[in-house]
Amino acid sequence: VQFTNDVGAWVAQQRWYAGKSHEPRFRILDARPVPGATRYLLMDDAGSLPALYHVPLTVVASPTTPDSVVGREADGYLIDATQHPDFTIGMLAEMGVDVSRVTGSRVLTGEQSNTSIVFDEDGQPTIILKLFRTLHHGENPDVTVQRVLSDAGSPFVPRFLGSLEAEWPDVGREHGVAHGTVGFAQEFLRGVRDGWTIALEAAREQRNFTEAARDLGVAVAGVHGALGAALETADATPEDVTATAAAWRRRLAIAAAEVPAVADRSAAIDAVYRAALERPWPRLQRIHGDLHLGQVLAVPDGGWRIVDFEGEPLRPMEERAIPDLPPRDVAGMLRSFDYASALGAGPDGGGWAAACRAAFLEAYAGAGGSVALDPVLLNALVLDKAVYEATYEARNRPDWLPVPLAGIDAALAPQSLG
């Protein structure tokens, strides 16, 4: 019991622990030896839904960082094994990655939901391992999608190197066993900057960003084309359309109840939704699912790499693998340009954002792999995104609420309605 309490107390203090709103109630679901550590799986039963945490631990005589210490043992200190090279290099080797040239590793700080470890080969950082802290049964879209894109030779994602699966007891599943991905490794991109930081600077300085926006349009189209060729696609059925419309209206009802300005516009928004339901819909396929400027990296020799294909964080994992509308990714990027403009340049940044949007759309439409963009359907998806943003900002950052409200008004303007 004391061991579980010590480990649980440490887990509850970590940034990746998702149960901040409740008092945790942990139990050890599984513990098995792995190279360099013991992999503990802790179930937190205290929330509305149980959550399973991945906690590899090892014992050392002397810890290298105080934050890694989980507790004391008779023979030393119990620490987070992600801080120990025997475990991290062992995990890489389990994935089938050649570790013969690995000379060191370090844990990246700032991660919110996972733990990322960078490995040096011959003194240069070349590999990054993402260790998932919250585990889910079944496919992880971040792994599946990046593997497929890398295998297809896509120049728009980091090269995929390997992944590692684990299984654990689950009485609710066939044979009493669940399985899922505990981590994956890919090429580490040196000297990159995220698109959000670059775009924000450009908007603040009113620098032309249209060439970068065009390159982004080509990259997103290329990813859509590769995913459509390699993974399942499907025609949008009447049931798909009905379910999408219900989700739009559910988010609109929530926003209208919390944001008076959205309530004032709800009839006009719903009219756009109704019009979109009558338009031709593209085939459904795998998409990024949570695309914005923070999910793209500019590499030093030019071009973009798209990362973090986990999908919308609030959606259940199994839903994120379901084929979806490619224009949803496009809408996410259009809204991201608006955010960069509003926060970087203020009220005078509308022209900058409009130029970025136009350049992105033109390049996407003309690139190989792109999906036809019906303007009314795209506008409905932009509206849905802005409506969701309005709820989020009203709850968390009221000072930012004007940004999605301006986006809603722009999408309702006559020239946006197709």
Descriptions of predicted regions:
Residues 286, 305-308:
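Pre-DFG segment of protein kinase catalytic domains
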Residues 100-104, 251-287:
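An alpha-helical support segment within catalytic cores of ATP-dependent transferases
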Residues 290:
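Conserved catalytic-loop position in the HRD/HxD motif
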Residues 294-298:
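Hydrophobic residue at the +6 position relative to the catalytic HRD Asp in the kinase catalytic loop
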Residues 1-30:
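Short Lys/Arg-enriched alpha/beta "domain-start" segment
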Residues 348-351, 355-372, 376, 380-418:
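ATP/Mg2+ or Mg2+-diphosphate-binding catalytic cores
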Residues 19, 24-54:
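Exposed beta-strand-loop-beta-strand "reactive/processing" segments of non-cytosolic proteins
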Residues 37, 45-250, 302, 311-345, ...:
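Conserved ATP-binding subdomain of kinase catalytic cores across diverse folds
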